[in-house]
Each structure stands twice: as structure tokens, then as C-alpha cells.
């Protein structure tokens, strides 16, 4: 055995395989069970419990966020409809007031026209009355003049 | 002869010598068990301290242990897959922790100050018995994982994608433990030897960069061992379509 001689050991050497091997294997298997119950299980429980807690919280937060978004959208549509409703009411009122204004204007115009017409008629009648009277007085005067002229002769 | 003087120098480093324990008629490498007990004891104390008072709001050691757990879970999950990684995580994690603690313990603690009647203390992973034990456990694990998950369909893996692969796949079953054990053993032993020789030749300053390199190698080897073990298990439980 080269290795034995090269390193000058009287017994054993680097590649001396003996009962250390199976005993070490048993020791490692035992260590696996010990570490499993002492380390992997308890730490795993804590870590996984926390991971579950965190992921649950995240899911809950996501649900809440989506709910909030839904409510927000709801509110937005409500706001939108309220706005259009308000616009409709305003325009309706505007139309109505416009109509009322026009009606009132027409009424006032008519009235004014009517009174103007009446005044005109009155003026006309008065004018003609005055003219009649004037022509009558002119007639009287001319008759008087004529009479006087005739009498003086 | 020059070679002879070199050999005696190497002998001064006590390479390939062991502290033998004789129980009945079986012989053990005592130094491997001594260091592994000390290091694993420290590991278990560390872990017990960290998990003594587990809180939802981690503090101090618990933080570190949770980071470690997360690291091992990621390693197992990426190599083995979402479906069965849970079953194998403790094994992969134990391999990682055992190799890591052994490598770093061997590199960081000045074992040489403790004199043994024969051999010297060092990284348990610098002993071929330890690495072969780990590698064989990995082999058993991936066979068990494949058979328990897929039953006899596990052997489809050997003729996948074509039956031409059969001899290579069978050969792989031997090369996997061989490469696993010798890679770890060789790297850690080489690191110890390089540091030992350098300290022997130039006791000041010069060994320090090599020691840092050794720490780096030690950590990388632990990661490689655990990753490959997880990869082999993942390969065995993978479903072919």
C-alpha cells in the first residue's frame, strides 16, 4: 500500500478504514434526528407560522384594497350620476326661466303694443275732433267775415 | 537520502497516525470521535440556546438560526423540488451543519496544543471514515427517496432517456459516493497539510492567508456536499415525462 508507506505510519495510515465508518454513520443519523427535533422542527414551525401570518395579512389587505377600490368606483359613478342629474336640473330650470322670460316679454310687448295702439287711436280721434272743430270755427269765422263784409256794403 | 529526510519531516506532522481505541475486537479512530463530540456538543448547545425562547419577533440567536434554517430550506427546495423537500430538509441540513462545523472547527481551533499519545486532533472530515460514512448515507438516502417516492418506477431513471445510459447510470451509483467522500476528504486534509507544512517551515505570518483560504474552502466544501446530496435526492425523486 503506497499510502501507508509514503506517510511512514507503522499502522493505519490515511486510508485506514475500520469501525469508525459505521459508527460515524450511526452518529450522523442520530444527529439528524436530534437536530430535527431540536432545530428544524421548532424553527420551521415559527418561521412557517410567521410566513402564514404575513401572507394572510397580505391577502386580507389585498381584499380590503379591492373592496376600497370597488367602493371608490361606486362612489365615482354615484358622483357622476349626481353631477349629470344636477346638470339636467340646472338646464331644465334655465329652459323654464328662459320660457318664462320670453312669455313675460311677449306679454309686456303685447300690452305695450295694445296701449300704444289705443293711444294712437285716441290721438287720431282727438286730432280729427280738433280738426273738425278747427274747420267749424274756420267756417264760422268765414261766415262772420262774409256777413260783415256784406253788411258794410 | 533527501526523500527520506522529507518523509521524516512529514512524519513530524503525524499524517496518517491515529489514536486507536480498542473495544472488543473493533478498532476506532479516537481523535475523530473526540473532535466530533466536542464540535457537535458546541453546535447542540448553540442551537439549544437559540431555540430556547422562540418568539414571533426573532431576536439575537434566534435570528441567526432562522437565517440558517431559511438557507438550508432554499438549498433543499431548489435541488429536491417543492414536493418532497420537506422530508429531506433535516438530513440535508444535518449534512451541511456537520460538515461545516467539522471543517471550521478543524481549521479554527488550535487542536495541536492538545497532545495525544498518538495522532492528533483535527477536523473529523479529514478522516476518510467520516467522509465515506457521509457519502454512503447520501447513497442510501437517494435510493430510499427514489424507491419510496416512485416504487419500482425508480429504475426507469437508469434507462432514461435511452437504455444506452444504463451502464453509465449504474457506474454513477459508484462514482457518486466515491467523488463525494474523496472530494471532502481531500480538500480538508490538503488544507490541514498545507497549513501544517507552512507553520512547520515558516511559523510567522505566511500561513495566515492560507488559513483564510482554508476557512473559505471549508465553507465551500460544506455547501458543495449538502448541495450535491440534495441534487442526488432530487434526481432520484424527479418525475420523467
From Swiss-Prot, chain B:
Record's keyword terms, sorted: ATP synthesis, CF(0), Hydrogen ion transport, Ion transport, Membrane, Thylakoid, Transmembrane, Transmembrane helix, Transport
Report TM segments.
Answer: 30-50, 91-111, 128-148, 193-213, 214-234
Instruction: Check the record and name the SUPFAM superfamilies matching this protein.
Output: F1F0 ATP synthase subunit A (SSF81336)
Q: One Pfam family name from the record?
A: ATP-synt_A
According to its UniProt record, where is this protein located? Cellular thylakoid membrane
How does the entry describe its membrane topology?
Answer: Multi-pass membrane protein
Q: Does the keyword Thylakoid apply?
A: yes
This protein's major location comes to membrane
Q: Name one GO cellular component term.
A: plasma membrane-derived thylakoid membrane
What GO annotations for molecular function exist for this entry?
Answer: proton-transporting ATP synthase activity, rotational mechanism
Q: What does this protein do?
A: Key component of the proton channel; it plays a direct role in the translocation of protons across the membrane.
Q: Which family does it belong to?
A: Belongs to the ATPase A chain family.
According to the record's subunit comment, the protein's assembly and interactions are: F-type ATPases have 2 components, CF(1) - the catalytic core - and CF(0) - the membrane proton channel. CF(1) has five subunits: alpha(3), beta(3), gamma(1), delta(1), epsilon(1). CF(0) has four main subunits: a, b, b' and c.
Q: What is this protein called?
A: ATP synthase subunit a
- Organism ancestry: Bacteria, Bacillati, Cyanobacteriota, Cyanophyceae, Synechococcales
Amino acid at each position: 500500500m503506497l499510502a501507508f508507506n509514503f506517510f511512514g505510519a507503522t499502522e493505519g495510515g490515511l486510508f485506514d478504514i475500520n469501525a469508525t465508518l459505521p459508527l460515524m454513520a450511526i452518529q450522523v443519523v442520530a444527529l439528524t434526528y436530534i437536530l430535527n427535533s431540536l432545530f428544524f422542527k421548532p424553527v420551521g414551525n415559527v418561521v412557517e407560522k410567521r410566513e402564514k401570518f404575513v401572507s394572510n395579512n397580505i391577502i386580507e389587505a389585498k381584499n380590503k384594497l379591492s373592496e376600497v377600490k370597488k367602493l371608490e368606483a361606486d362612489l365615482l359613478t354615484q358622483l357622476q350620476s349626481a353631477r349629470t342629474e344636477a346638470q339636467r336640473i340646472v338646464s331644465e330650470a334655465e329652459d323654464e326661466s328662459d320660457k318664462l322670460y320670453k312669455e313675460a316679454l311677449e306679454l309686456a310687448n303685447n300690452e305695450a303694443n295694445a296701449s300704444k295702439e289705443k293711444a294712437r287711436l285716441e290721438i287720431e280721434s282727438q286730432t280729427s275732433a280738433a280738426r273738425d272743430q278747427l274747420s267749424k270755427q274756420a267756417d264760422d269765422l268765414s261766415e262772420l267775415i262774409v256777413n260783415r263784409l256784406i253788411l258794410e256794403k | 537520502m533527501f526523500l527520506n529526510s522529507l518523509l521524516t519531516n512529514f512524519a513530524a506532522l503525524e499524517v496518517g497516525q491515529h489514536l486507536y481505541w480498542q473495544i472488543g475486537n473493533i478498532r476506532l479512530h479516537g481523535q475523530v470521535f473526540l473532535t466530533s463530540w466536542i464540535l457537535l456538543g458546541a453546535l447542540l448547545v448553540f442551537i439549544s440556546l437559540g431555540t430556547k425562547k422562540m418568539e414571533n419577533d426573532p431576536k439575537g440567536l434566534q435570528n441567526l438560526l432562522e437565517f440558517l434554517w431559511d438557507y438550508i430550506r432554499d438549498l433543499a427546495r431548489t435541488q429536491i423540488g417543492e414536493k418532497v423537500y420537506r422530508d429531506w430538509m433535516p438530513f440535508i441540513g444535518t449534512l451541511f451543519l456537520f460538515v461545516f462545523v467539522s471543517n471550521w472547527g478543524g481549521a479554527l481551533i488550535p487542536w495541536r496544543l492538545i497532545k495525544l499519545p498518538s495522532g492528533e486532533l483535527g477536523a473529523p472530515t479529514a478522516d476518510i471514515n467520516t467522509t465515506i460514512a457521509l457519502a454512503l448515507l447520501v447513497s442510501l438516502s437517494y435510493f430510499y427517496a427514489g424507491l419510496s417516492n416512485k416504487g419500482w418506477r425508480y429504475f426507469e431513471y437508469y434507462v432514461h432517456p435511452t437504455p444506452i445510459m444504463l451502464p453509465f447510470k449504474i457506474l454513477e451509483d459508484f462514482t457518486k459516493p466515491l467523488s463525494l467522500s474523496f472530494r471532502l476528504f481531500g480538500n480538508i486534509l490538503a488544507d490541514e497539510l498545507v497549513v501544517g507544512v507552512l507553520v512547520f517551515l515558516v511559523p510567522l505570518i505566511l500561513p495566515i492567508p492560507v488559513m483564510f483560504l482554508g476557512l473559505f474552502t471549508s465553507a465551500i466544501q460544506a455547501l458543495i456536499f449538502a448541495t450535491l446530496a440534495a441534487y442526488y435526492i432530487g434526481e432520484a425523486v424527479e418525475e420523467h415525462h
